[in-house]
Amino acid sequence: MNAPTRTPPPSNGGHGSTGSTGSTGDAAPGGGTGRGPAATARGHAALAKTQVLIEALPWLSRFQGATIVVKYGGNAMTEPALREAFAADVVFLRHSGLRVVVVHGGGPQITAHLERLGVPSTFVGGLRVTTPQTMDVVRMVLLGQVNRDVVGLVNDHGPFAVGLSGEDANLFTARRRPAIVDGREVDVGLVGDIVEVRPETINALLGSGKVPVVASVARGVDGGVYNVNADTAAAELAVALGATKLVVLTDVEGLYADWPASDEVISELSITELEQLLPSLTAGMIPKMEACRRAVRGGVPQAHVLDGRVPHAVLLEIFTDDGIGTLIMAESGTSPEPGTPPAPAARPAGIVPAGEPTGGTP
């Protein structure tokens, strides 16, 4: 389809010239030609917008048909303006030819609902103690509230989102996980580690042009239902799908070089460099960086940790030359240039063993 074009102004022999009728061109209020400072400013603004589009072009070309898994959480999930921006980003990616999967938790929403029920929230070793009563609330909130909210937000911008959980079609299979406190195992209830991923359903949805939105609960090998970490779930799914990128939204700018002594953000680092830093990271960042490490070690070319407080953070990272946040790659200095061959296609459908356990729970 041809792009629409602007209708050119009528020719009058040039600025200030007169034709046989004595016309001096399009008059503006006050006798000017409409080419004053306001028009110039509009032209500069339009030019800036075209520069943004041109900068995005090689990245749009490179990632055409690529699969991207986004772990959605933090302020981007709770602040109305950021929620709208995220949903718009997802639909923009879909219209740009990318295959997008959203994985979410919902820790704050679960805690708030438990408080309303008078049920205290207890955490041991970063894991929510999940009794059968608590697990009922986790499922209800993640599937009945958070998942429906995310699906609705995305579908307000385009009818693509389909909600499901790790239980559906046995997408995730989990095994019970204890917490480790002072070197000892502590039972925390229905908390699990993902041990298998069946990506067939997600691949089918992606193949039909949909955007799967996945809640982080899993069916257990024992037939039970388990609360699983959303960062880890996103990483395992990215590996199983053969994704090009894993994107993790956080409430910080990225990985800091020497926190708290410095607020300098590391722009990119290799997986080896990340593994050297892991023991020194703060507790809140460890599960996110462990998820990135798992994804890259599992064959995902790139993992990103982004500040979800920045509107349209996902688009800024993927479609601009500088990006934002922290990029983790297989080897330092090997971030792909626009126009390089895309990552391998998704793995064939089937059961994909998951990696080692990481992260806390919602």
Swiss-Prot record:
List UniProt keywords, sorted A-Z: Amino-acid biosynthesis, Arginine biosynthesis, ATP-binding, Cytoplasm, Kinase, Nucleotide-binding, Transferase
> What is its subcellular localisation?
Cytoplasm
Residues engaged in binding substrate: G106, G107, R128, N227
* Annotated segments matching region Disordered: 1-42, 329-362
Q: One GO molecular-function annotation for this sequence?
A: ATP binding
Q: Using the record, list the residue span of the signal peptide; answer none if the entry has no such feature.
A: none
- The Enzyme Commission number assigned here is 2.7.2.8
**GO CC annotations?**
cytoplasm
**Role this protein plays:** Catalyzes the ATP-dependent phosphorylation of N-acetyl-L-glutamate.
Instruction: Provide ranges: composition bias, Low complexity.
Output: 346-355
Record SUPFAM superfamilies: Carbamate kinase-like
Q: Name one GO biological process term.
A: arginine biosynthetic process via ornithine
State a single Pfam family of this protein. Answer: AA_kinase
Q: Which domain of life is it from?
A: Bacteria
Q: Which InterPro entries does this entry report, sorted A to Z?
A: AceGlu_kinase-like_sf (IPR036393), AcgluKinase_fam (IPR004662), ArgB (IPR037528), Asp/Glu/Uridylate_kinase (IPR001048), Glu/AcGlu_kinase (IPR001057), NAGK-C (IPR041727)
- Annotated site (Transition state stabilizer), which positions? K71, K288
Is Cytoplasm given among the entry's keywords?
A: yes
Q: Where is the composition biased (Pro residues)?
A: 1-11
**Taxonomic classification, please?**
Bacteria, Bacillati, Actinomycetota, Actinomycetes, Frankiales
Q: What is this protein called?
A: Acetylglutamate kinase
Q: Which family does it belong to?
A: Belongs to the acetylglutamate kinase family. ArgB subfamily.
Pathway where it operates: Amino-acid biosynthesis; L-arginine biosynthesis; N(2)-acetyl-L-ornithine from L-glutamate: step 2/4
